[in-house]
Amino acid sequence: MINFESNSPEQTQAFAADFAKKTLNGTVIALIGNLGTGKTTFSQGFANGIGVKQSVISPTFKLVSEYEGERVLNHIDCYRLESSQDFLNIGGENFLNCDNGVTLIEWAERIKEVWHEDWIYIYSVSYTHLRAHET
């Protein structure tokens, strides 16, 4: 388990950028936490770490955003989904094996039925306590 405590959005982004450089293509990262606890902030830093130049925002209404950088970033937001079945209905499983990039899933706790033991789970409690857990 990796523990990281952040005292600011900037620290969260810096941690995420460094973490991104250590991930392999095909990695799925589940971001779990309440509203306003830094999931999108983490995603922004992560995107920066893999060379995404575009502005990264939470795809709450789009559900999925794809970004090109040194590697592809699939950014999924499950906030508006009611169940894992909703995730499957939008073709979410197609983003879980990205050979040329990484998939970040915000609000992953809403799709627990599709969780996999190979995923990395990051629990955001608040900006002052971001806990990364790798299984």
List where the protein language model places each region.
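Hydrophobic anchor at the beta1->P-loop junction of P-loop NTPases
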Residues: L31
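Conserved nucleotide-sensing/catalytic segment adjacent to the nucleotide-binding pocket
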Residues: E68-L104
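Walker A (P-loop) phosphate-binding loop of P-loop NTPases
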Residues: G36
